[in-house]
């Protein structure tokens, strides 16, 4: 049974064609008079979604840690080892330990991946203060759930593999950065479509009043409805499948907010 969990993930995502910010920028509108959020937006921050245990409740890196991070990320990009995906760059840069993503077969190197943006936050999650997804009801009391084993090491059947290993879903929204971490937003008067590069998933979100589907119907990416609150697009999503094991898909409702803050940046929160 799902329980309500409350988190706040905040980050700024940038348009692919980013240039210098224009100081006199005014909010753009579509022909229908809606805030214009259309474009291809990239989330390439190096900041992990969940905070590493080593930081406890510390929200920011020290100046020394950030300088070390910048230097090590540059060094890792020049090395010949396997590429580091998602949070792996952050962990390797701070710990000095670089582990292969796929030691059995190897992988392409870092030169094939996008340059990462370095910020001083220790996690994208800012609430709860520990920077981590809250536990499901029961998990805090030591109850364990029957979930597929992470990774693809010696599975006995396809049921032992996670839905991301099986290329079914990486969750919606897809929050990991630096690899397939682009969203394309397309708008009409009645709908917003968010195409996630990862798994090529398209979220078709009505902007018109329409009741949610029956609560007995559960979907990988839930059932979304959207509306505009001033310059902000608000998307409320319910009816997530129990099979969607990603932390932000375990609540009864996800509320996302998209606010364009200049021509090339969008403020996103969940």
Model-identified regions with their sequence ranges:
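Sec/Tat signal peptide C-region and signal peptidase I cleavage site
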Residues: 16-20
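Bacterial N-terminal signal peptides
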Residues: 6-15
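Positively charged n-region of N-terminal signal peptides that target proteins for export
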Residues: 1-4
């Amino acid at each position: 049974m799902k329980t309500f969990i409350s988190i706040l993930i905040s980050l700024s995502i940038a348009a692919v064609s980013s240039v210098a910010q224009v100081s006199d920028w005014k909010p753009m509108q579509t022909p229908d008079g809606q805030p214009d959020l259309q474009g291809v937006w990239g989330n390439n921050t190096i900041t992990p979604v969940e905070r590493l245990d080593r930081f406890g409740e510390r929200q920011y890196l020290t100046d020394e840690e950030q300088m070390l991070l910048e230097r090590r990320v540059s060094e890792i990009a020049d090395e010949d080892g396997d590429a580091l995906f998602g949070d792996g760059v952050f962990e390797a840069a701070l710990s000095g330990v670089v582990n292969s993503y796929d030691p059995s077969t190897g992988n392409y190197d870092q030169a094939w991946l996008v340059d990462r943006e370095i910020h001083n936050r220790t996690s994208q999650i800012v609430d709860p203060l520990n920077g981590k997804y809250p536990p499901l009801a029961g998990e805090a009391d030591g109850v364990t759930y029957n979930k597929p084993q992470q990774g693809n090491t010696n599975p006995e059947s396809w049921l032992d593999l996670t839905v991301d290993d099986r290329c079914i879903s990486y969750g919606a929204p897809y929050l990991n950065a630096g690899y397939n971490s682009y969203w394309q937003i397309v708008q009409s008067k009645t709908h917003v479509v968010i195409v996630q590069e990862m798994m090529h998933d398209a979220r078709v979100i009505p902007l018109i009043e329409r009741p949610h589907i029956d609560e007995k119907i559960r979907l990988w990416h839930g059932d979304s409805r959207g509306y505009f609150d001033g310059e902000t697009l608000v998307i409320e999503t319910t009816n997530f499948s129990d099979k969607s094991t990603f932390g932000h898909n375990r609540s009864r409702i996800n509320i996302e907010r998209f606010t364009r803050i200049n021509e090339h940046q969008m403020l996103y929160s969940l």
